[in-house]
Amino acid sequence: MRHGLMEAACERRIPMPNWCSNRMYFSGEPAQIAEIKRLASGAVTPLYRRATNEGIQLFLAGSAGLLQITENIRSEQCPGVTAAGRGAVSPENIAFTRWLTHLQNGVLLDEQNCLMLHELWLQSGTGQRRWEELPDDVRETITVHFTAKRGDWCDIWGNEDVSVWWNRLCDNVLPEKTMPFDLLTVLPTRLDIEVNGFNGGVLNGVPSAYHWYTERYGVKWPCGYDLNI
């Protein structure tokens, strides 16, 4: 239902990636209108956001050698994530290998796929790897990536320490709400796009989230601000 309604609402694209003023009218059954109001107010659980955080953590775990592939897979997008080579055929490494395949395939972050990716994250055991317990060389590798992508992977206005950020990813609290009129809950984004980040530069041959959003949603911030419902 959501997908069809939003396709109709977004049929007229406005070529302006920053701020747009829109007036939308919806008609439908009471249950449909109630769902649209929940979307407009942000009262929707953003499963894609959890899948994104888990994906970033798995990406870093592979880059730092905490997790290794169990098959001969070469990541053309980011060779560093498989640089540690093949590892033991353990449940954790098998889960990582399956997750990496989904990253390479650019899986859509719809509800079903987000739940599947969450199961792989749980099986990988990454959430149990607290910062204080990581080897020094692993922490150094993670810190290098974090420093380069801080603005994309956490609050751009914040000054969160890498250790606090990593442990927050381990805690993996699922947000109860999202931004008003969050289009990413309606027209799903992709795992590789979100790991690559708004400014890109992490994965070779993958668009930045900025370019993906402006092409797919018509704006670079696909959510609502200052809504009157």
Regions found by a protein language model. Give the residues of each.
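Short, Lys/Arg-enriched N-terminal segments with co-localized hydrophobic residues
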Residues: 1-15
